[in-house]
Amino acid sequence: MGKRFAKQLGQFIVTLFGITFLTFCLTYLAPGDPVTMLLETADTIVSQQTIDETRAQLGLDKPFIVQYANWVVNAAHGDLGMSYSAKKPVVDRMLEALPGTLILAGTALVFTILYALPAGILSAYNRNKWIDYVLRILSFIGVSMPTFWLGLVLIYIFGLKLGLVPIASSRITATGVILPAVTLAVVVGSKYMRQVRLVILEEMQKDYVIGARARGVSEMKILFSHILPNAVLPLITILGVLIGWLLGGVAVVEMVFSWPGLGNMAIYAITMRDYPLIEGFVLWVAIAYMCINALVDASYVLLDPRLKRERA
């Protein structure tokens, strides 16, 4: 168990170094000057001397590898630098936006499970029947639709035409989270529904299900007492991947709905060339994704006693 933990920790650290180094390379090679964006406005032209002094204050005059090494050392102590656009520490700016993203992703996850699990099970139990074809077509459409396009359609129908929900929300509200959460849930839920269908179909063909049916056990009991307990592990694995996608993929949806979250913050940071904020966002996504994978891996041990004995 200790060796496995050490191995996972090593992979965690190496992955973080790789992701942050790549992000640093991209921001370093990106066209444009963040200092010029920071200082100049439409009515003001800043002297080259002021630009050079500001660049030196921010440490942007140093070689690339020195900048990266300084950032890694500071990040290890919880200091991700100052946001150019927000004029405050990156950590503080991200903590302001974090609740919005967590609420949106959490609500979308609930909608995803409520939609995908019943639809996937229903599709599997009615394989090659009309309801199966309808659900599979709907899931194909859901997977194929870009989130920004679906979001705009939902805004037009439920916001502009019907007036049931706000078109956009700059604050976190119960009504404001509905449309962006539904937008995410349709796309993510369609992916998950197809995986649920495949997992349930695979379990339905196994000997223990055939034997239970031969003994006259009801379909409901077979589903809830046999199929679903055995399908939990693969379904949790797939769900863990989708949760990671939710946390990292909310940026477009947050922008469309003006939702105050990390994704919206990151897109604004990109337009303003706010490199410390961009790097902080990428670090957050990487850590969140790897932590979710670690939790999924740990859940295996809790749900499957055989794995616990193997790793003891």
In which residue ranges do the predicted regions lie?
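Membrane-water interface segments at the C-terminal ends of transmembrane alpha-helices
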Residues: 23-29, 58-59, 73, 137-166, ...
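Alpha-helical transmembrane segments of integral membrane proteins
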Residues: 2-3, 94-131, 170-312
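Hydrophobic alpha-helical segments of integral membrane proteins
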Residues: 9, 50, 54, 64-80, ...
